[in-house]
Structure formats: structure tokens, C-alpha cells
Amino acid sequence: MHDDIKLVSGEEIVKPTGEVHVVYFSSISNNTHRFIQKLSVKNSRIPYELEEEINVDSDYVLITPTYSGGGEFTSGAVPKQVIKFLNKENNRNYCRGVIASGNTNFGNTFAMAGPILSKKLNVPLLYQFELLGTQNDVEKINEILKEFWGK
């Protein structure tokens, strides 16, 4: 689906330790927030307001929506709040994988934030889902996270 996906080899993947934890960003629409509430894992929300911040001190998987106009318009695919969060070295260093949401109406830029962040952070893109996700997406992500943590 995305031409610029960098495959992370098995040797490069750093498996997370500790409690299963997702860090996520959700816009005012709260689509991602509502999805996260269906997961059975510890979670931390990246604040919407750029002046606010959180610091993470344990391994996590990042879940983010995608912002972009579709087609050739991939600029701005990663929300500014996520970029600000990851600009802190400590937050960036604990990220072990990425899951992205998007809208299939935008064609080949569907969930584009996932491949962009996976490549930038050199972590695996674990899953992509549409908008609010389905019950199947919830079950699949719970399974992926449990397996990724080795639980």
C-alpha cells in the first residue's frame, strides 16, 4: 500500500519489557480515544494542547491518527502533537512499535503516519486500522500487543 515502507528486520526489533502500554494521540473528534478505551491495556494520552506535555519512562507502542489530504499530499501526516512528543529523546527512545489509523478514502495515504514513524524511529509498523476501528481491529490489536510483549 505504501511505497516507502522500510521493513524492520527481526534483529533490529527491540522487544518491549514491563507492562503492556500504549501511548496515543487523539484529536478533538476523539476517534482514536474511543478506540483506545476498547483495548484492555494501560494507556497514556498525548495532550491536544501543544503547551502541555507528557513524559514516558517505560516501553510503549504509539497509536496515532493520520492527517493528510490524500494523493500526493503527505505533508502533515503525523500530527504536530506527536512530533512534539517524539522530539523528547526519552519519549522517542521508549517507543517499540507503531499502530496508525486513517481513512481509506484517502487512497495510498491511508494511515500514512504509521510508515513515516516506523521508518523514522526504526520500529515495526504493527497494524493499521480505519477511523474508529472495528471489534475485529480491537481483538487483533490486543492480540498483537500481548504477543509483542511476550505475554
Curated annotation (Swiss-Prot):
GO terms for molecular function: FMN binding. GO terms for biological process: protein modification process. InterPro entries: Flavoprotein-like_sf, RNR_Ib_NrdI_bac, RNR_NrdI. Gene3D superfamilies: 3.40.50.360. It holds the Pfam family Flavodoxin_NdrI. HAMAP family: NrdI. Belongs to the NrdI family. Probably involved in ribonucleotide reductase function. NCBIfam families: nrdI. This is Protein NrdI. It comes from Mesoplasma florum (strain ATCC 33453 / NBRC 100688 / NCTC 11704 / L1) (Acholeplasma florum). The gene is nrdI.
